[in-house]
């Protein structure tokens, strides 16, 4: 088991306002599998990623348990957040690669479909799609036991998105645990790469299961993802 949340509740208390963003969340991310979080804006998906990667804000108060085994790689929702703005993407990727012997920059870029001709560009001079792919490459270079990707294909055309999903699936098949946050159920259905879907609503896990299992659910919060 690469990671598990046990009855995790997260309250954000800034002193001016307080909000419960996660309530009694139970979640398992298994080795060798792709687990996908589905939900609307504000339903708590990114907060789950923050909990698993140690990125919860200082104002967060938690109860429950967060259990993580091994190294965790993270692909942020906005890929440019994975990079400093004052150095080229290539320089930063090479720095990451220098501490790890498993992945080379060339291999990581190929897996993420990041074009080699963009390596010399500053992050902000990449297109939205390019910098998102670069962020995937950066995460792979850390050789994580668990990869967490927050909307990794949101800025990509369909062909490139398929390629990134294929890379994610291959990484899981090599033994890693993968957690992906996405809104693109059509692409998810087309690839068939998800082993488990976890649907969230208002900070809670509604249900979890395979794509086929959830398609037959009677819960309206689940059915809406499979209608139309």
Ranges and model annotations:
Residues 78, 85-101:
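Q-loop/switch helix immediately C-terminal to the Walker
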Residues 143:
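Conserved catalytic motifs of ABC-family nucleotide-binding domains
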Residues 122-126, 130:
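Conserved ABC ATPase signature
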Residues 147-151:
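Catalytic Walker B motif of ABC-type/P-loop ATPase nucleotide-binding domains
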Residues 199, 211-228:
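C-terminal boundary and immediately downstream tail of ABC-type ATPase nucleotide-binding domains
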Residues 136:
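Hydrophobic anchor residue at the start of the ABC signature
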């Amino acid at each position: 088991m690469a990671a598990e949340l046990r009855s995790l509740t997260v309250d954000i208390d800034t002193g001016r306002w307080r909000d419960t963003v996660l309530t009694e969340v139970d979640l398992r991310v298994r080795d060798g599998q792709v687990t996908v979080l589905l939900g609307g804006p504000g339903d708590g998906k990114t907060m789950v990623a923050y909990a698993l990667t140690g990125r919860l804000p200082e104002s967060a108060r938690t109860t429950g348990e967060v259990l993580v085994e091994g190294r965790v790689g993270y692909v942020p929702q906005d890929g440019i957040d994975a990079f400093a703005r004052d150095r080229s993407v290539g320089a930063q990727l090479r720095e990451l690669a220098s501490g790890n012997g498993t992945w080379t920059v060339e291999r990581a870029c190929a897996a993420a479909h990041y074009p080699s001709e963009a390596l010399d560009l500053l992050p902000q001079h990449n297109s939205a799609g390019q910098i998102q792919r670069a962020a995937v490459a950066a995460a792979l270079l850390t050789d994580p036991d668990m990869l967490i990707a927050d909307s990794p294909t949101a800025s990509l055309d369909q062909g490139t998105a398929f390629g990134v999903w294929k890379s994610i699936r291959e990484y899981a098949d090599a033994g890693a645990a993968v957690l992906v946050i996405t809104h693109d159920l059509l692409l998810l259905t087309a690839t068939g790469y998800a082993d488990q879907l976890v649907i969230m609503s208002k900070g809670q896990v509604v249900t979890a299961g395979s794509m086929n299992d959830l398609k037959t659910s009677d819960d309206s919060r689940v059915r809406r993802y499979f209608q139309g």
